[in-house]
């Protein structure tokens, strides 16, 4: 395992520890979320991404900064916050729960993004032998499949196409 990956794993453990101590639940998504659902590290990652409920946005930012992260003013505050911690980039994005059990990001550019019930559950993934909270397979698959059709979406990159194939295989095995 290279130094960058070790730093990202350390950051994942630290963010989870700090937010859980503050009563804030987070879920990995993106490449690290997929790796957690697969149960092993499959590739290098450019950053670490977490979802959390919008009502915890300010509290999460405050406890992460207090613990040593630096918040960056690079994203609309109603949507997400980007950080660095010991030179490792990461972000928190925000969702809201809907009455039907699904989830959305109703504020800002991604208001047409919808995630199915169960996207943010209690079943952990695994990274480097450690259980970690991760967005569900069905949630990540919905997220990836919808992206090109969103109002502000973009075409899939090759890594998105590869991720969708893996997520479909994982979903079929559930």
Show which residues each predicted segment covers.
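Compositionally biased terminal segments of proteins
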Residues: 1-174
């Amino acid at each position: 395992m290279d130094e960058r990956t070790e730093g990202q794993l350390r950051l994942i453990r630290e963010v989870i520890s700090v937010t859980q101590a503050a009563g804030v639940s987070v879920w990995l998504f993106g490449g690290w979320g997929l790796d957690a659902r697969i149960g092993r590290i499959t590739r290098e990652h450019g950053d670490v991404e977490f979802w959390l409920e919008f009502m915890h946005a300010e509290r999460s930012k405050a406890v992460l900064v207090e613990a040593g992260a630096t918040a960056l003013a690079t994203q609309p505050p109603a949507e997400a916050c980007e950080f660095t911690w010991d030179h490792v980039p990461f972000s928190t994005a925000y969702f809201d729960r809907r009455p039907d059990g699904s989830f959305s990001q109703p504020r800002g550019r991604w208001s047409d993004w919808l995630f199915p019930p169960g996207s943010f559950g209690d079943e952990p993934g695994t990274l480097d032998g450690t259980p970690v909270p991760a967005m569900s397979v069905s949630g990540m698959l919905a997220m990836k499949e919808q992206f090109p059709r969103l109002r502000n979406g973009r075409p899939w990159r090759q890594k998105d196409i590869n991720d969708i194939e893996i997520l479909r295989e994982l979903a079929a095995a559930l």
